[in-house]
Amino acid sequence: MVKSPLKALVISLVFLFVLGFLFPTVTSLITEKALPNQSEGQPIKIDGKVYGSYLLAEAFNSSIFFHPRPSAIGYNLSESGSYPYSLGNPEVLNLTEKYLDEFLKDNPGINASQIPYAMLSYSASGLDPNIPLQGALIQIPRISIALHSITNNSVSLWENYLNDLVNKYTTQNFPFFGSYYVNIMYLNVNILEYLMNNGYIKSLNSIPP
């Protein structure tokens, strides 16, 4: 037990300095050096400009991109959240049917049984960039046809490219027993950079619908 008020004050100031300044500063500096991209929030940089983060989903509505999970907030990066409905609320079923119809319309040729439920349900944050592996694979035919229409590459060539891309960015949320998922932001940025680097798209404003 510290009896002297002066000693107690000194100890408090030392702990305040170490835990409130020194430790956070050292940790931040180490993180910036060891993981520079992660420490900055994994920003998406195109032509030297930041256009978002790989950690936050955005609305990729064009047919040449992988589509994310539904969002209750319209992918608004300034907020996060979901609908205030319980699972037993009839509105949840209505929304699921709506998302199912939209997904089938955007991806003709697939069956409803092929669609993972996560692709038909909104995430808790509304900004989840990860989708199930199956949710990415069933979008490849649609994307391949769309990319073929604006490039000289065949549909089969695009299918191979996209399959390799999905495999590259597929991760498992838990080792051995976890499910496989893929971050669509990495997939779509790769597609965008390929098209821009090869002259198929001049700028972000010239992305086809």
Swiss-Prot record:
Q: Name one Pfam family in it.
A: KdpC
For this protein, the record's InterPro entries field holds: KdpC
Q: How does it sit in the membrane?
A: Single-pass membrane protein
Compartment(s) of residence = Cell membrane
Tell me which UniProt keywords the record has, alphabetically. ATP-binding, Cell membrane, Ion transport, Membrane, Nucleotide-binding, Potassium, Potassium transport, Transmembrane, Transmembrane helix, Transport
GO terms, molecular function: ATP binding; P-type potassium transmembrane transporter activity
* GO cellular component terms, semicolon-separated: plasma membrane
Q: What sections of the protein cross the membrane?
A: 10-30
Ion transport as a keyword?
yes
Q: Whom does it interact with, and what assembly results?
A: The system is composed of three essential subunits: KdpA, KdpB and KdpC.
Q: Which family does it belong to?
A: Belongs to the KdpC family.
What job does this protein perform?
A: Part of the high-affinity ATP-driven potassium transport (or Kdp) system, which catalyzes the hydrolysis of ATP coupled with the electrogenic transport of potassium into the cytoplasm. This subunit acts as a catalytic chaperone that increases the ATP-binding affinity of the ATP-hydrolyzing subunit KdpB by the formation of a transient KdpB/KdpC/ATP ternary complex.
Could you identify this protein by its name? Potassium-transporting ATPase KdpC subunit
Source organism per entry reads: Thermoplasma volcanium (strain ATCC 51530 / DSM 4299 / JCM 9571 / NBRC 15438 / GSS1)
